[in-house]
């Protein structure tokens, strides 16, 4: 604004950023443009000439794509020309300004405001394409002989491009009419779900260029057909927690569901499975190889990892039931790491997780002209805005369970003042005399069944190993640490055994916005209206952990 008489102007936040004119980038055949965009900022990319793809999904000509909070690469087989320009500042929900998540959002000095961008001539895309053609040959053989299609397990260290390879192979398969099942076994990032989940999805249509894997069902239109993921909750940071005692059974349950789907769907059986794994399994830590063995048995890049895989699995027979009477063999192939793979620090990954959770409840705030064109919308841009339903619940009416596993990298303090307001610990005998013997026995049973190594109730539950499942029911009053965390609503009954709760798939997620321990109520956000179904609920206390600022 101007100061009268002095012809001076005061800078304002609205005038600080002046977008640079669009930049044209010409790529020769076999090269790719690599770029990084911070959260809270956006760039727009348009394909002016030639052909190009992002992680295997082809870009439409003359359509503008918007990217925010991503590290990606656009590859061309025959050469192309791109136009890159600065996008609008992303306004997040409830006053988290243009700075984005975790204080990020600094616009860079690259084309369109990229934090980093450059053109690379050497890429491993030819290797990835050769893998696709080899898989296609195996799929054609599977169709001719009636066998199962190839099952691909992708292993490698952190930030090696495993998920990128999975996207490329999936995109190429769908492009030729195949229908692969993609399995995500990495709880650090969600695939069509929130972090802390293990998912399996059958891909029948193209993936979304701007959103990666695409989107799951929602109450609204979608330019790209939605995907239907099968979701299991694993509220721990990595598979090695509790020596894999929780991770392995969930993987087995997920593999059983995938096997059942393939038995009923001829197209997915012929196409096969693509499994993406966490990088920590390839770091050589104790217990990693056992979990890899388990994954190979159920679903069946470093030199040391490659040598171990060659020694243990190359040309060895598979263990699947369908291969029992055949001569199927496991083949180990080493792929080059792309030079575009960059390290994703803890702050960036935290922003990724918060963005996935925010998108689950509130939709995608990034305006997209490409989606508007695909959806035949009258507006020039479109963004998907969802309205979650807020409601208060009596904590007493909920069956909330929590995994009682000490973190491997820190000693967690379980102290919560709300648990000691009306405690009966200091009464004679440490127990309320008004309680009957039935209540005492129920509490003893609950405690015994939640601690590994202690004898649980006899019968079927004991036989199934329920006493070894480190799940404990959270008793009233509601702990204050419940605020700003996720609750996973399972498909099993609230009084189910710990093993049944652990192995149950997920119906949906709730976000705890506030906790009133005195009144025994919690305020939650739900993706749909109506009463919360009477199901067992698992608390994501340890992972994905606390998400602050989702609501005001």
Curated annotation (Swiss-Prot):
This protein's UniProt keywords: ATP-binding, mRNA processing, Nucleotide-binding, Nucleus
Region (Disordered) location: 409-470
Gene that encodes the chain: clp1
Complex formation: Component of a pre-mRNA cleavage factor complex. Interacts directly with PCF11.
GO cellular component terms attached to this protein's record: mRNA cleavage factor complex
Protein name: mRNA cleavage and polyadenylation factor clp1
Main location: nucleus
Domain of life: Eukaryota
Compositional bias annotation for Basic and acidic residues: 432-444
Family, per entry: Belongs to the Clp1 family. Clp1 subfamily.
Subcellular compartments: Nucleus
Biased composition (Low complexity): 459-468
Task of the protein: Required for endonucleolytic cleavage during polyadenylation-dependent pre-mRNA 3'-end formation.
Biological process, per Gene Ontology: mRNA 3'-end processing; tRNA splicing, via endonucleolytic cleavage and ligation
Gene Ontology MF terms: ATP binding; polynucleotide 5'-hydroxyl-kinase activity
Stored InterPro entries: Clp1, Clp1/Grc3, Clp1_C, Clp1_C_sf, Clp1_N, Clp1_N_sf, CLP1_P, P-loop_NTPase
Chain residues that bind ATP: 32, 71, 159-164
